[in-house]
Every structure is written in structure tokens, then in C-alpha cells.
């Protein structure tokens, strides 16, 4: 896509999704330092610290759909457990397969794997548990969503040793979403969004 934001809006219209003002910050961070020349479609790393009624899982699922409906894309949903990652995975499955009728080339609810063969190549979305870091090694990712990331044990290690390297080759994006929980690694990442280029953070 020439412009991710253009396609994103087309997709939101297609699925009849109208984000509220807080969700818009996740989908399209403010212009300026968060939209560098190397990444005109927005911040690569977004940290959203939001309450339980925000709809963060739903908005993250919309981001996943935007990516996985393009050819040759890889999306991971990483959470403290498979039970947690299943929530966003299920939202995506229900929208693409149940509501829109797209036919997956492979689907496993147990393994949380969903693949599509598009005209330009295969794309995949899968749910993963941070309890099993060995499962976070391998293919390059276009998008990684870290759900309830403040509750991921050893988040710093998981991010730096496993997830961040998977984003390098494709210049992939990461979205950290979580409810507030102390001043650990999630809070440190939140502060990066206030000070570092290509990072953006907000709370709601």
C-alpha cells in the first residue's frame, strides 16, 4: 500500500468501525516527530495505557485486520497467556471469516493460527504466549500486538531479546496495550513515547 493510513480508513469504513477520540490516537498518532520521513504512516511503536472500558483490544484487532488483509504479512498477538491472546485473535477471526466470509487457507483455534492466501501471497496472524519465549523466535513480523503487556513477566527481556528483533527486517510495528499497573517495564516504555522518535504513548 502506498499509504497505510489511506487503506486503514478504507478498511474501517468497510467493517463499519468508527473509533472514538481515544482510539484514534492509537490508529493515527499526531503528526510531527511521530511521523518521521522513514515511516510516514505513523509511529512504529505505540504504547497505550488505558482503562478497561476503552476498547483497546477491539481497536488493536482492527489494526491487525488492516495488516493481515494485505499480502505477505505476519501479525503476532503476544500476551501473558494463550487465554489472553485468544481475545484479540477471536475478534479478528470473527470479523474476517464469520462476518466477511474470507476463506482461510489454514485455521486452528487451539494453536491460534489463521492464514489467508491473497493474490499477492500468504499472510498469517497468530496468538502467542509470553510464557513460552521459544515460540517468539523465527519469522519477521509486520505487526506485533502486546496485549496486557504490563502483566507480561520479564517484559523487558521478552521485548529486547525476542520481539524487537523480529521487527527489524520488515521495519515492523509494535503496539503495547495494557491497563495501568505500577512502574515497571511497561511504564518505562510508556515514557519512551514521550521522549523518543518513532515512539508514541498516551493514556486514557
Predicted segments — roles?
Residues 1-204:
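Phosphate/NTP-binding elements of NTP-utilizing enzymes
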Amino acid at each position: 500500500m502506498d499509504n497505510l493510513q489511506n487503506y486503514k480508513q478504507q478498511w474501517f469504513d468497510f467493517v463499519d468501525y468508527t473509533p472514538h477520540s481515544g482510539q484514534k490516537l492509537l490508529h493515527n498518532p499526531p503528526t510531527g516527530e511521530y511521523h518521521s520521513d522513514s515511516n510516514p504512516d505513523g509511529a512504529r511503536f505505540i504504547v497505550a495505557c488505558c482503562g478497561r472500558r476503552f476498547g483497546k483490544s477491539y481497536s488493536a484487532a482492527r489494526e491487525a485486520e488492516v495488516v493481515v488483509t494485505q499480502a505477505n504479512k505476519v501479525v503476532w498477538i503476544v500476551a501473558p497467556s494463550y487465554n489472553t491472546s485468544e481475545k484479540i485473535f477471536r475478534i479478528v477471526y470473527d470479523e474476517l471469516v464469520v462476518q466477511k466470509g474470507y476463506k482461510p487457507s489454514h485455521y486452528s483455534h487451539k494453536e491460534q493460527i489463521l492464514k489467508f492466501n491473497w493474490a499477492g501471497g500468504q499472510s498469517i496472524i497468530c496468538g502467542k504466549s509470553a510464557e513460552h519465549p521459544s515460540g517468539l523466535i523465527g519469522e519477521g513480523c509486520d505487526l506485533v500486538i502486546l496485549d496486557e503487556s504490563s502483566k507480561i513477566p520479564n517484559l523487558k527481556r521478552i521485548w529486547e531479546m525476542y520481539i524487537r528483533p523480529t521487527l527489524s527486517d520488515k521495519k515492523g510495528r509494535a503496539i503495547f496495550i495494557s491497563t495501568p499497573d505500577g512502574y515497571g517495564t511497561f511504564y518505562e516504555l510508556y515514557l519512551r513515547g514521550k521522549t523518543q522518535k518513532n515512539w508514541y504513548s498516551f493514556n486514557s
